[in-house]
Amino acid sequence: MRVLGLETSCDETGVALYDSERGLLADALFSQIDLHRVYGGVVPELASRDHVKRMLPLIRQVLDESGCTPADIDAIAYTAGPGLVGALLVGASCAQAMAFAWGVPAVGVHHMEGHLLAPMLEEQPPRFPFVALLVSGGHTQLVRVDGIGRYQLLGESVDDAAGEAFDKTAKLIGLGYPGGPEIARLAELGTPGRFVFPRPMTDRPGLDFSFSGLKTFTLNTWQRCVEAGDDSEQTRCDIALAFQTAVVETLLIKCRRALKQTGLKNLVIAGGVSANQALRSGLEKMLGEMKGQVFYARPRFCTDNGAMIAYAGCQRLLAGQHDGPAISVQPRWPMESLPAV
């Protein structure tokens, strides 16, 4: 089965073609970072308009690169949520229109299920069951995964997601957008131990997260330095390192708890923040000590992309699931409500 996947949940337009027998045939992505950088964050209306502009050229590019034509497409998968409603509607409308015109089924995919299954595109994919850490700009969740659609939420952020905290913290100390890569870049130049930030909600039982207070702690630390006349680039680097270390160690502590609680040995990390090298290194060390294994997608499939949507959609289509012709999206959509495959 050849499935065309469309991703338009936020600020990246992703298109990919996945073959259930041959694997990924082609993928293309356009990032709107430059469009939104001047505003310091994503502007939903601009994101929607740019998706409209980019979608068809990217589809043509993927078809050309794969050597396929519309007649070779067996189905279309699209991100139906969660995400920005206008952006989601662009992808859903395009998918349903093409499905009608080409006479093929369409299926709406849960954005975070796409992220969760992205490591399945690698040469050594994880096997069920496992614990998944979904960590992105909009979500920070720990999930027990027993199969596709068989999800048990173990813990989640009660306020800011980790990726959101990275972006907001970067803005507070005068860094550019997107903030996550900027924080990581400066952290490499930071002085270890100059600042020590708290590890939120690690001194109590449970698997929930909270990063809002850490963001405030960072702001207060930066303001004290500025008032003391020390707003140097090195101070920014030292604060970036302290912040990143606090986030990473908080995630590590919670992941260790989740693995012990479930008795599982394998961990999947997915979402944009999973590209962070400090987090990857920490998890690899921790899982080595626990005689387990950590799995993640290649860096370009950690952020939003069409490949993960094409793959996730293909699994549901092969199980006989597909949508009717109505155009429907879900900006808020609990992943544990998905049907099992």
UniProtKB/Swiss-Prot annotation:
InterPro entries: ATPase_NBD, Gcp-like_dom, KAE1/TsaD, TsaD. Pfam families: TsaD (PF00814). SUPFAM superfamilies: Actin-like ATPase domain. It catalyses: L-threonylcarbamoyladenylate + adenosine(37) in tRNA = N(6)-L-threonylcarbamoyladenosine(37) in tRNA + AMP + H(+). It comes from the Bacteria. GO terms for cellular component: cytoplasm. Fe cation binds at residues 111, 115, 304. Substrate binds at residues 134-138, 167, 180, 276. GO terms for molecular function: iron ion binding; N(6)-L-threonylcarbamoyladenine synthase activity. The keyword Cell inner membrane does not apply. One of its GO terms (biological process) is tRNA threonylcarbamoyladenosine modification. Its EC number is 2.3.1.234. Binds 1 Fe(2+) ion per subunit. Its cofactor is Fe(2+). Its main location: cytoplasm. Belongs to the KAE1 / TsaD family. Required for the formation of a threonylcarbamoyl group on adenosine at position 37 (t(6)A37) in tRNAs that read codons beginning with adenine. Is involved in the transfer of the threonylcarbamoyl moiety of threonylcarbamoyl-AMP (TC-AMP) to the N6 group of A37, together with TsaE and TsaB. TsaD likely plays a direct catalytic role in this reaction. NCBIfam families: gcp_kae1, T6A_TsaD_YgjD. This is tRNA N6-adenosine threonylcarbamoyltransferase.
